[in-house]
């Protein structure tokens, strides 16, 4: 392989180096976003830890004083699944694992499953399994806001209170650590009465008013925690994917540079041999 071959390898080395710069930069950005979102998740979880016991106590009191749609549900045969995917790609198997979790949940019950999709990347997956979402939310911030959580909650609650669905479930990737994420389905409505603590409480001025306000606050906070956890999982998966891509680029660069040096050394050796041979012929 002569000069033309060396030039081709040089071009490949340059291309891989440019790709490596991109994957390395994306990995650093994902790391920064993960750190910021993790901090917000920790703060929001503290809020949930405070409000959840209040809701559990209200659940016990509501059960003792009569039925309530938040705990009893309704007669609809349909179930709502809020499926949280990403708006951006290059995050490994993040989206496919979430959709696989959804498929395992609905199985042969597609006719009674209503899907609200969060994130644009999940739409292609849903089309492949012939599911049309009843609602879509795209462009969620890297650190999901309370207003974004409220918008999703309002849609789900409206369908539940109208009797369109008897359950509200959220399918997402739960962030456990930077090296471990778990896809799961969590039911947020109706709320199980078994979650309530023992004993009853006197609620004034009215249980229904207090209950509705407390549930709205709690469930919006719960949905925001899930959105934040999903974003952490997404950024963690992207960080891992970009780190792997960068390492692969490094390995490829090493091989290309070794090949380049071998060819160049071979060309130099050949030139020296030709010079020596020419000198010997003249003698």
Swiss-Prot record:
Entry keywords, A to Z: ATP synthesis, Cell membrane, CF(1), Hydrogen ion transport, Ion transport, Membrane, Transport
GO molecular function: ATP binding; proton-transporting ATP synthase activity, rotational mechanism
Cellular localisation: Cell membrane
Record text on subunit structure and interactions: F-type ATPases have 2 components, CF(1) - the catalytic core - and CF(0) - the membrane proton channel. CF(1) has five subunits: alpha(3), beta(3), gamma(1), delta(1), epsilon(1). CF(0) has three main subunits: a, b and c.
Database matches in CDD domains: F1-ATPase_gamma
Its membrane topology: Peripheral membrane protein
Classification via InterPro entries: ATP_synth_F1_ATPase_gsu, ATP_synth_F1_gsu, ATP_synth_F1_gsu_CS
GO terms of biological process kind: proton motive force-driven plasma membrane ATP synthesis
Organism, scientific name: Clostridium beijerinckii (strain ATCC 51743 / NCIMB 8052) (Clostridium acetobutylicum)
Domain of life: Bacteria
Full protein name: ATP synthase gamma chain
Family: Belongs to the ATPase gamma chain family.
PROSITE patterns: ATPASE_GAMMA
GO terms under cellular component: plasma membrane; proton-transporting ATP synthase complex
Function: Produces ATP from ADP in the presence of a proton gradient across the membrane. The gamma chain is believed to be important in regulating ATPase activity and the flow of protons through the CF(0) complex.
Transport as UniProt keyword: yes
């Amino acid at each position: 392989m002569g000069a033309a071959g060396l030039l081709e390898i040089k071009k490949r080395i340059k291309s891989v180096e440019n790709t490596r710069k991109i994957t390395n930069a994306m990995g650093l950005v994902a790391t920064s976003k993960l750190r910021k979102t993790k901090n917000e998740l920790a703060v929001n979880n503290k809020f949930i830890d405070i409000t959840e016991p209040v809701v559990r106590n209200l659940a016990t009191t509501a059960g003792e004083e009569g039925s309530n749609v938040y705990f009893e549900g309704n007669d609809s045969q349909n179930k709502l699944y809020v499926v949280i995917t990403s708006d951006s790609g290059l995050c490994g198997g993040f989206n496919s694992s979430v959709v696989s979790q959804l498929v395992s949940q609905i199985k042969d019950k597609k006719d009674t499953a209503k899907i609200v999709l969060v994130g644009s990347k999940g739409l292609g997956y849903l089309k492949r399994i012939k599911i049309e979402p009843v609602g879509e939310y795209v462009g969620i911030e890297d650190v999901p806001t309370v207003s974004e959580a409220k918008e999703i909650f309002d849609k789900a609650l409206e369908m539940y209170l109208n009797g369109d669905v008897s359950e509200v479930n959220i399918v997402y990737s739960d962030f456990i650590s930077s090296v471990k994420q778990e896809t799961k389905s969590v039911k947020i409505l109706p709320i199980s009465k078994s979650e309530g603590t023992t004993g009853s409480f006197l609620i004034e001025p009215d249980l229904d008013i207090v209950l509705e306000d407390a549930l709205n606050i709690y469930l919006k906070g719960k949905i925001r925690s899930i959105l934040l956890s999903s974003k952490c999982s997404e950024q963690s998966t992207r960080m891992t994917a970009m780190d792997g891509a960068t390492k692969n680029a490094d390995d490829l660069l090493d091989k290309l540079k070794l090949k380049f040096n071998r060819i160049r050394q071979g060309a130099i050796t050949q030139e020296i041999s030709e010079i020596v041979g020419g000198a010997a012929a003249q003698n």
